């Protein structure tokens, strides 16, 4: 399944600000759906990783985050887009993409240094599980967690526990939980996640179905796509920049697919 993380770039279709599109479920659905039609990709994204998620989740001492997540404008718009896709006769594959717990932990520590790792990751795991449940019950087919960097060595177990909490909720709802990590040297893929390694992150021990992560910059995509027998998904390490020009994106995807 070819599914580069294309979201904000869809706002070019209507010539509106990507942030405005991300807060309007109908515009989100129309523009992202039209982008999929133009490019011939295999999935649509109802959300992309964004810094507002850390604010909605809050620190461990901020209490239950369920109400804050449900009230978040971007979350509400994404869920509304999923509902509209549910009524779409074409029934596209819908994926929700979020920041992962390591990225969220780093953001929360910028605002509140010294947060205890165990308490922080436990809080993030519960919060991401709530988020996954919201999207799974609304009708997404997959959730992707994108990490800007791997967790510090001393926090790997806490990080894996947080991913496991969210991943268990996804699997309960029969939604694929995917992990993408930008760190080129990262190879310690948690069993709870569908790994999506980049070219330098593949491991001989990865003998289960997994994906492949291309660069978030289409200029760095290969001339032709090559996938192994266990690679079921091709996405990108991060969101394709919203300012990337659509004509060039059409050409890059056509070359990638060998068209």
State each model region's role.
Residues 55-134:
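Active-site-proximal, glycine-rich beta->alpha crossover segments in alpha/beta enzymes
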Residues 14-28, 110-126, 130, 211-216:
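Active-site mouth loops of central-metabolism enzymes
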Residues 1-80:
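Alpha/beta catalytic barrel-like cores
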Residues 27-51, 130-142, 169, 193, ...:
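Catalytic domains of carbohydrate-active enzymes, especially glycoside hydrolases
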Residues 63-93, 154-179, 183-185, 256:
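Alpha-helix-loop-beta-strand connector modules within alpha/beta enzyme cores
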Residues 174-259:
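Catalytic-face loop-and-helix region of soluble metabolic enzyme cores
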Residues 50-54, 58, 95-112, 138-162:
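Active-site-proximal loop/short-helix segments
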């Amino acid at each position: 399944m070819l599914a580069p993380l294309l979201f904000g770039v869809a706002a070019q279709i209507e010539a509106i600000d990507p942030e405005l599109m991300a807060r309007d479920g109908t515009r989100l659905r129309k523009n992202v759906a039209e982008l999929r039609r133009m490019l011939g990709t295999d999935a649509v994204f109802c959300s992309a990783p964004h810094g507002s998620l850390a604010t909605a989740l809050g620190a461990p001492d901020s209490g239950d985050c369920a109400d804050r997540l449900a009230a978040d404008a971007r979350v509400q718009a994404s869920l509304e887009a999923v509902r509209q896709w549910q009524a779409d006769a074409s029934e596209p594959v819908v994926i929700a993409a979020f920041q992962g717990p390591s990225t969220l932990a780093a953001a929360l520590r910028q605002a509140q240094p010294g947060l205890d790792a165990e308490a922080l990751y436990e809080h993030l795991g519960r919060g991401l599980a709530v988020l996954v449940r919201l999207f799974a019950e609304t009708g997404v087919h997959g959730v992707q967690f994108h990490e800007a960097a791997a967790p510090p060595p001393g926090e790997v177990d806490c990080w894996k526990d947080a991913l496991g909490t969210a991943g268990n909720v996804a699997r309960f709802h029969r939604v694929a939980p995917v992990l993408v990590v930008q760190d080129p040297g990262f190879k310690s893929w948690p069993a709870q996640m569908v790994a999506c390694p980049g070219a330098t992150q593949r491991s001989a021990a990865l003998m289960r179905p997994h994906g492949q992560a291309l660069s978030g910059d289409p200029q760095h995509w290969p001339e032709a796509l090559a996938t192994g027998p266990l690679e079921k998904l091709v996405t990108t390490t991060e969101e394709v920049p919203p300012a990337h020009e659509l004509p060039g994106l059409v050409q890059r995807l056509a070359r990638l697919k060998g068209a």
